[in-house]
């Protein structure tokens, strides 16, 4: 089968011919329809320091997808041939304390699809049936293919009660924009998103965010005054991994504010901890999606009218995969979809 693989320990990704993965007793064989390029895939493409430490070569990469079930393991129940599915990209052990306690998203032995085991940038993918999620009929293939990053956004945004709250989102990447859209959809009062990339900020404006702020040109305190905010943000969603953005968030949070952090800093990050202490801030780290509560909420949000379509900006055939990676690497894109049909 055709597959996009990290074939060499250098920048790039290559179209390869690899065997169709073998189906285990508890697995599903999925024929891939569409995949989306993640920021993680860009790290792997660029072969940065994290990738060099993490990715075995050769490796079929990718973990954002939608497809249909074409093979079912002997022990699998609840699925049938032809089911349209996406899937949780974190394969958990099932044996650690968190897994046995129902907190599988906190499994300390997590294996990543397309990172530690063969991924979805291929004609076929095998995953445990436990990890598959059936896609409702009224959700398109394009939207289903970005459920993985959408899940990061939903998990982050819905960590706290947002109804009537003022929310600051730092980082207008696709996940940050989707998190801001979720916050607005579920009843936040003001949702402000910050970045220095004007293309991405314009995408956020198309999604109906209260204010998209280029912090290289505007002062966040002025924006808060313009919105009639007198006490600071109630909830912060840190999606950028940029230390200056997090420090600004700490400066502008209200006392008793709550922060969910998904963005990963490039290295050790120093902050003024007295602001955390004296403001009584609550900080929560976010990794992946809750299995599978986040997935059900994702589907329900779209079915209840949340429109994510503006976040998908580029679509290519898999034969034009290089154009897709070029678009992602440029910073002038939202989500990029690759079609395998």
From Swiss-Prot:
The UniProt record lists the keyword Cell division: no
One MF annotation (Gene Ontology) recorded for this entry: L-threonine 3-dehydrogenase activity
Binding site for Zn(2+) 1: 38, 63-64
Location relative to the cell: Cytoplasm
Lineage top rank: taxon: Bacteria
Pathway(s) it belongs to: Amino-acid degradation; L-threonine degradation via oxydo-reductase pathway; glycine from L-threonine: step 1/2
The protein's name in its UniProt record: L-threonine 3-dehydrogenase
Species annotation: Escherichia coli O157:H7
Phylogenetic classification of the source organism: Bacteria, Pseudomonadati, Pseudomonadota, Gammaproteobacteria, Enterobacterales
Gene expressing this chain: tdh
């Amino acid at each position: 089968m055709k597959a996009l693989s990290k074939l060499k320990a250098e920048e790039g990704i290559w179209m390869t011919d690899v065997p169709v993965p073998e189906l285990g007793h508890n697995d599903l064989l999925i024929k891939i329809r569409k995949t989306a390029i993640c920021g993680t895939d860009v790290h792997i493409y660029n072969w940065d320091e994290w990738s060099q430490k993490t990715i075995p070569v050769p490796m079929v990469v990718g973990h954002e997808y939608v497809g249909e079930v074409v093979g079912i393991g002997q022990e699998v129940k609840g699925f049938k041939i032809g089911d349209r599915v996406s899937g949780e990209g974190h394969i958990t052990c099932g044996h650690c304390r968190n897994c046995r306690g129902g907190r599988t998203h906190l499994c300390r032995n997590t294996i990543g699809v397309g990172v530690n085991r063969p991924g979805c940038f291929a004609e076929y993918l095998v995953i445990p049936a436990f990890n598959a999620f059936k896609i409702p009929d009224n959700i398109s293939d394009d939207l289903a293919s970005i459920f993985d990053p959408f899940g990061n956004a939903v998990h982050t945004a819905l960590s706290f009660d947002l109804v009537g709250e003022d929310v600051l989102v730092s980082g207008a990447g696709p996940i940050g924009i989707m998190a801001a859209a979720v916050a607005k959809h579920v009843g936040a009062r003001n949702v402000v998103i910050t970045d220095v990339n004007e293309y991405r900020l314009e995408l956020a404006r198309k999604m109906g965010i209260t204010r998209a702020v280029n912090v290289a040109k505007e002062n966040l305190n002025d924006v808060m005054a313009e919105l009639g905010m007198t006490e600071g943000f109630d909830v912060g969603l840190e999606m950028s991994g940029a230390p200056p953005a997090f420090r600004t968030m700490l400066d502008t949070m209200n006392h008793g504010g709550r922060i969910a952090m998904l963005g990963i800093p490039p290295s050790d990050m120093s902050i003024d901890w007295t602001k955390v202490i004296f403001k009584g801030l609550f900080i929560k780290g976010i990794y992946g999606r809750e299995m599978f509560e986040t997935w059900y909420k994702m589907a329900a949000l779209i079915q209840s009218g949340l429109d994510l379509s503006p976040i998908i900006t580029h679509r290519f055939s898999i034969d034009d995969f290089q154009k897709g990676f070029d678009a992602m690497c440029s910073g002038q894109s939202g989500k990029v979809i690759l079609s395998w049909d």
